[in-house]
Regions:
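Outer-membrane beta-barrel channels and translocator barrels
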Residues: 21, 118-120
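Transmembrane beta-barrel architecture of outer membranes
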Residues: 7-13
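An active-site-proximal structural segment forming one wall of the substrate-binding cleft
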Residues: 123
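Surface-exposed loop/interface segments of Gram-negative outer-membrane beta-barrel transport/assembly proteins
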Residues: 2, 17-108, 126-177
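Outer-membrane beta-barrel architecture
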Residues: 15, 112-114, 118, 173-175
């Protein structure tokens, strides 16, 4: 729907069940998910700027004062800027999507394992563990022509943010039937 946008997802799962002996069994599952999102999407500025509203309210033509090409090449509607309020109420949605690079990538690994031992008939011990790690990276760059660069004195800027979340759990269960 939007220019300069996209989504990609890759998933994988591996499951392993093995009876090691008459009384001992091992189970494991490994999951992998990678997602990549590109573009500003339907909202930017943490929801304060609604791209769909900008598309619906954008002037379709330049009218008598501008050619259509001039209107399409401006980041902010010139009539909005002429009143002196420096209002960014009407941003050109085409120019905005072309002028913002917003890439979000997330990679998640998850591993579960369990070892079950039937000590005697009716008495079972099970130890299980889970390990999860998620790596995130967000690259945002506001080029000349974006409303963010306009607010920054018409100077482009950007940022990169990376994060990692790691979780581990373990449980041991003794069951008597």
């Amino acid at each position: 729907i939007f220019k300069n946008s996209g989504f990609d997802k890759t998933t994988g799962k591996f499951r392993f069940n093995q009876k090691l002996s008459k009384d001992l069994s091992f189970d494991a599952t490994i999951n992998y998910v990678q997602t990549t999102r590109e573009g500003v999407g339907t909202s930017a500025d943490n929801g304060r700027f609604n791209m769909l509203a900008q598309i619906l309210s954008a002037r379709p033509t330049g009218g008598l004062r501008l050619t259509d090409e001039e209107l399409l090449e401006t980041a902010i509607d010139p009539e909005m800027l002429e009143d002196g309020s420096e209002s960014l109420a009407q941003v050109n949605p085409v120019k905005q999507t072309e002028s913002v690079t917003n890439n979000k990538r997330a990679e998640m690994w998850s591993a579960n394992g369990a070892l079950t031992w039937e000590i005697i008939k009716g008495l079972t011990f099970k130890t299980a563990g889970t390990y999860n790690t998620t790596n995130n990276r967000i690259d945002i760059f506001y080029k000349d022509g974006s409303k963010e660069a306009y607010r920054n004195g018409q100077k482009p800027y950007g940022r990169t943010q990376m994060g990692r979340d790691v979780r581990w759990s373990n449980n041991n269960t003794l069951t008597w039937k």
